[in-house]
Amino acid sequence: MNLQQQLAYCQQHQQRLQLRHFDNETAWQLGEKIKRQAEKQGVALAIDITVNHQTLFSYAMAGTCAENQDWLRRKRNVVELLSTSSYAAGLMLQQRETSLDARYGVSLRDYAALGGAFPLQIKQAGIIGSVNVSGAPHLDDHNLLLQVLADFVGLPTGSIELLTPLTPLSA
């Protein structure tokens, strides 16, 4: 899958993975679902769900460390800045051959355009926050969120195309 294809999928994902409503109880349910999926996949994740700058769910699985919490913060900051997933932001920067600090003047100590943070978007209302994970390779973090969110919003299993490592454009 090349860069253009991945960007197109990221746009589709953000359109399809919208919620009807979201509250503190929803955050708890989503966070628990992410934890169960991580356990199934055998990965240890730090999980954070933030709405309007308030943390509604936070959990650090055994095997994570303080560094994972920092990655959560940096990825979440990208979602808040650009209103797109942290993975899609990284792809857009690659496409433009630039970086977060060069394009937006932000510190890379505070922002990370790597997979693992996804906007929480309410249908016909907009983005209210983000769901964030850290602990696996960043593409795996992103795909785990896609899987869980697809199930959470009631999409049929397999209806969301998971992303694969980038391949160069053929000549």
From Swiss-Prot:
It comes from Yersinia pestis. It comes from the Bacteria. Belongs to the UPF0303 family. SUPFAM superfamilies: GlcG-like. NCBIfam families: PRK02487.1-3 (NF002694), PRK02487.1-5 (NF002696). Coiled coil: none annotated. It holds the Pfam family HbpS-like. This is UPF0303 protein YPO2534/y1653/YP_2345. Transmembrane segments: none annotated.
